[in-house]
Amino acid sequence: MTTNIHDQRILILDFGSQYTQLIARRVREIGVYCELWAWDVTEEQIREFNPNGIILSGGPESVHAKDSPRAPQYVFDAGVPVFGICYGMQTMAEQLGGAVLGSDMREFGYAQVEVVEQMALLNNIEDHVSPNGNALLDVWMSHGDKVAAVPDGFITAAKTDSCPFAAIVHPEKQFYGVQFHPEVTHTRQGQRMLSHFVLDICQCEKLWTPDAIIEDAVARMKKQIGDDEVILGLSGGVDSSVVAMLLHRAIGKNLTCVFVDNGLLRLNEGQQVMDMFGDHFGLNIIKIDAEERFLSALAGTDEPEAKRKIIGRVFVEVFDEESKKLKNAKWLAQGTIYPDVIESAGSATGKAHVIKSHHNVGGLPDDMAMGLVEPLRELFKDEVRKIGLELGLPYDMLYRHPFPGPGLGVRVLGEVKKEYCDLLRRADAIFIDELHKHDLYNKVSQAFTVFLPVKSVGVMGDARKYDWVVSLRAVETIDFMTAHWAHLPYEFLGKVSNRIINEIDGISRVVYDISGKPPATIEWE
């Protein structure tokens, strides 16, 4: 009998912090299931979820602003421990009768808090010791307002010179609040604080482990699918690859994978996918060579968003045609992951702005009349990778740098042509090859080459040449929300440039992109 890995759970209410998903990932890393919901959740939904504890995230608002978000009153009446982080602490303090002081001065960055009263959340945690013998903690602050008076029953557990209530606790109700962010790595022992809350205070067991997740997913899919057949669009990316391996374990030959080669993939990628999943793992896999169809549809289009939509539309058409040939397939599998679910759910009162449209199979026709199988919809990307390793997928494939859904369609600037894609594929392969050879690949977060639709004069021997330009792009980032351009050695960049120009007829110049994010995005389109 499989363990109920969802039996013990933490609810995280999102007040808009850029770090909120990080809180959820940290709780999962501890080994406990959690879900992330918008702050305006109803009492009925909380009751139904029945959490062992609740975490209130940070957020950009001031509790003094009109219509600023508040925790549902039931959070404080549910009889479970509550942990307020930054804004979460402020709204808890004000809602329970304390006072929050507005401030035009933000405290942002490293700070040192002094523990003045022991509490379970900070038990046996110290980074330094103060002259009077108290524990000092290295933490990360990001706030404007601050608590000025604690509600009845609360005591002060930690302070800084500028923040007298850096950590507070209601010992009887087990309500905790901190003005810093334990979820970020800059708070040196933040993970221990979260672990104290989840394991010691909420008394959850570590049931959420890769092998248990696999066992649970396989059991649920067997129950859902039975003896039916399933079709999966396999791209060779992390998500669809892990879905393929999970389904193969659950239903074996009743899975058919469809791999659409759109002509916008990396060098030899199509053959690598077929070799790995067809020959090595023994999956049923159909390869569709659709390069000409995609490039014909893209001809004459140079606007990035229009290109994305065309690539998505043509994929749906090709996949739909192939699925209709598989008359026994009653289920469609997708690699939806938890951040996709969070993004789709949103807040009942929130607003969102699309910077770039996401490329996935979400737009499949209504008349496909298939059930949906989404075994990864509870998982974050880092969890998907861990599952993939457990299932036998190679590390190099699972931890490869991100590749956009539209592929080279958004790395060839302007109109996409076969000539441009072929040149770009080879140039990019040289860049990645040299990164591996110089042990730099895993030291940057993402690296790729971009084709620029401009020609430049060059000299090769005694001959003048007039050929295309490519740009190398490499960035360092923790969360891909902000990024620095990677300071790769000049000698290395020179070697990559020489190889590209000497080995590829058609490229005369190589440049290096030194733009950060912001203001630039990581991808050029």
Curated annotation (Swiss-Prot):
Pfam families tied to this protein: GATase (PF00117), GMP_synt_C (PF00958), NAD_synthase (PF02540)
The residues that the entry says bind ATP are S235, G236, G237, V238, D239, S240, S241
Signal peptide (UniProt feature, chain positions)? none
An MF annotation (GO) of this entry:
ATP binding
Q: What does this protein do?
A: Catalyzes the synthesis of GMP from XMP.
Domain (GMPS ATP-PPase): give its ranges. 208-400
Named in its record, the pathway it takes part in is: Purine metabolism; GMP biosynthesis; GMP from XMP (L-Gln route): step 1/1
- Look up and give the organism this protein is from: Pseudoalteromonas atlantica (strain T6c / ATCC BAA-1087)
Q: What is this protein called?
A: GMP synthase [glutamine-hydrolyzing]
Lineage, highest ranks first: Bacteria, Pseudomonadati, Pseudomonadota, Gammaproteobacteria, Alteromonadales
**EC number(s) reported in the record:** 6.3.5.2
**This protein's encoding gene:** guaA
**Keywords from the UniProt entry:** ATP-binding, Glutamine amidotransferase, GMP biosynthesis, Ligase, Nucleotide-binding, Purine biosynthesis
Reaction catalysis annotation = XMP + L-glutamine + ATP + H2O = GMP + L-glutamate + AMP + diphosphate + 2 H(+)
Q: Where is the active site?
A: C86 (nucleophile), H181, E183
Q: Subunit structure of this entry? A: Homodimer.
